[in-house]
Amino acid sequence: MKNITTLLFDVDGTLLDATEFIIQATEHALSVKGLSVPDRTTISKNVGASFPDYYFSLTGTHEHTNELIEIHRTFQYSNYHLAQPYPNSLQTLKYLKAKGYKMATITTRSKKTSHQTLINAGVFDLFDVIISGEDAAALKPDPAPLF
């Protein structure tokens, strides 16, 4: 077996607890558009999909998708503090970096929100590569962002 030299991490739900960051943005966007706001369990089950698929799964229509995405992002730009690092994530990443591992993150979120939440968590500079939603032709779980 070859030695492992590189580690890949998801951001939301692995390094950061972004539950409130995502759910509150979703609730806000749907409310602003006057649409029905599903319960938090339903919202959580759909997290991770592309924005168009995410909002379609919650509303059953593509009619307001672009507006919902814009409202969602605007909310997040003012509420980065809602994404918090999990306990010991900073210490663990520092330990791995000190051991010489190359490290990268892969997320479906935008570059702006993923970078800022990683900066706020104090882990941004520990990564050699940060792959965001707009960096790849296909999103997770497709392996395309890795190549």
Placement of each model-derived feature along the sequence:
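Short loop/edge segments at beta-strand edges and connector loops
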Residues: 87, 107, 132
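Structural motif
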Residues: 46, 106-108
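Substrate-recognition "cap/lid" segment bordering the active-site pocket of phosphatases
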Residues: 82, 110-147
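A short linear-motif detector with a strong N-terminal bias
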Residues: 23, 109-110
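Short active-site oxyanion
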Residues: 100-105
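N-terminal helical cap/lid subdomain that shapes the substrate entry/recognition surface
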Residues: 2-90, 95, 99, 115
